[in-house]
Amino acid sequence: SKDEGEKPFWISFADLMTALMTLFLVVMAVSLMVVTKKINEATQAEKERSSEILDICMSIKDDPTLKNQLITVDCKENRINFGEAGRFGHNDYRLNAEGIKALSALVPVVLEAANSENGKKWFKQIVIEGFTDTDGSYLYNLNLSLRRSEWVMCSLLDPTFNPELTLTDEQKNQIKQLFLAGGVSFNAAKDSKEASRRVELRMQFYGLKEKESAEAQPIFVSAPIEKCQLAR
């Protein structure tokens, strides 16, 4: 009939817009779900990372070997403090016998933690930080703090510094890769000058995707006998 012939064949513009809006909302909802899922996965991964790093630090802190030492392990800041044992005399970069003894007890514990399942996954390096008081110029204190850090490294690798610390060649190579000597001058002074003249160890850990893009660690060949270059 005439009426049937005049019925519109195409859908109305309003119906078309409604369909497009519905499709747009569906696409947006799916996209939002995907983004939310990725955020939740990243959040969960970061929680797991933080938990595993805490386990690494606590394994060092709770090790019975360190029970009678003056060492303080701060698992919130990931720092290791030697207290009185890690202090230096004025204008002196030589770690005292008590500090070397504490270091001897600590290093095998740290290496064991670094070689654990979580340690291999997250442990990046340990920065040996030497500090000074505020006496003298900046460059003077920078040099002094560097020598204090280097003295700690000498205590780990030069057998004449610390006969009590017996390490295998593999452990010595791991120390060269894991430990980093760095000076900090007087940027973090304590309440007293005596407390400021100290050495601390700062543990650093990989980020979630950092290790995947990290460059390969250099391979160090152990010398028959490592010899410290600092004057004793």
Stretches with model-predicted labels:
Residues N78-D92:
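Acidic/histidine-rich, surface-exposed loop or edge segments in extracytoplasmic proteins
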Residues Y93, A97, V127-E210:
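Periplasmic OmpA-like peptidoglycan-binding domain that tethers envelope proteins to the cell wall
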Residues S50, C57-M58, E77-I80, K101:
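Charged linear interaction tracts used for macromolecular binding and regulation
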Residues I60, P64, F88, D92-V127, ...:
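Periplasmic peptidoglycan-binding/anchoring modules of Gram-negative envelope and division proteins
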Residues N68-N81, W122-K124:
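Short edge beta-strands and adjacent turn/loop segments
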Residues S213-R232:
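Short, cationic low-complexity segments
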Residues S50-L54, L103-P108, S149-C154:
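Well-ordered, non-membrane alpha-helical segments in soluble/globular domains
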Residues S1-T65:
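Short terminal targeting/anchoring segments
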